[in-house]
Regions:
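P-loop NTPase motor domains
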Residues: 1-176
């Protein structure tokens, strides 16, 4: 039984964690992989050709990268939504960010943008995509935890068995 992991997202008394932004700090280049995979997930869920576009991708990419720059102050999907909507939290993250491209984006591009590109217009457009996960009482405790309950790499390397219950009955189609 030690080689079998059973993950049932609908089991709410003690939810397992799955931080979709978690990466191995020994390999900082994984941050780009995480961002690209998240964009791929959102594309599959929302058909980003019609619901996204270059502005969505630019703000989303820089929000996730900013969150990933300082995992100690939070690096979950909840924190991505928060970094977009909460200026004080965004400033905290920026004060700890060592990526000059990300800092430049938030200080020079997003911070100074007006009209349709302003944060006031862009933020609800992006955070609305996160609401599927964050407003769901089953999913929020799973994706809002900092440390995942299991590591996919470890499962594969140690030849463990991962069983995931993705029944749509309680989770809904998008969350499954």
């Amino acid at each position: 039984y030690e080689d079998v992991i059973y993950f049932d997202p609908s089991y709410t008394p003690r939810p397992m964690a799955l931080n979709m932004l978690e990466y191995d700090a020994r390999y900082p280049e994984q941050k780009t992989f995480v961002v690209n995979e998240m964009l791929s997930i959102f594309n599959k869920l929302f058909d980003m050709k019609t619901a996204g576009g270059p502005m969505f991708e630019q703000y989303f990419r820089n929000a996730v990268l900013l969150v990933l720059e300082d995992p100690e102050s939070g690096s979950t999907l909840v924190d991505v939504s928060r970094v977009l909507a909460d200026k004080a939290f965004r400033e905290l993250k920026l004060s700890r960010c060592t990526n000059p491209i990300v800092v430049q984006f938030w200080r020079e591009i997003a911070g100074k943008a007006g009209g349709e590109a302003s944060l006031a217009n862009i933020v609800p457009y992006i955070t609305s995509k996160f609401d599927v996960f964050l407003s769901n009482d089953i999913m929020r405790p799973i994706v809002g935890q900092q440390k995942s309950s299991f590591q996919f790499r470890e499962v594969m390397d140690n030849k463990k068995i991962l069983l995931v219950n993705l029944s749509k009955g309680r989770l809904g189609d998008i969350n499954a």
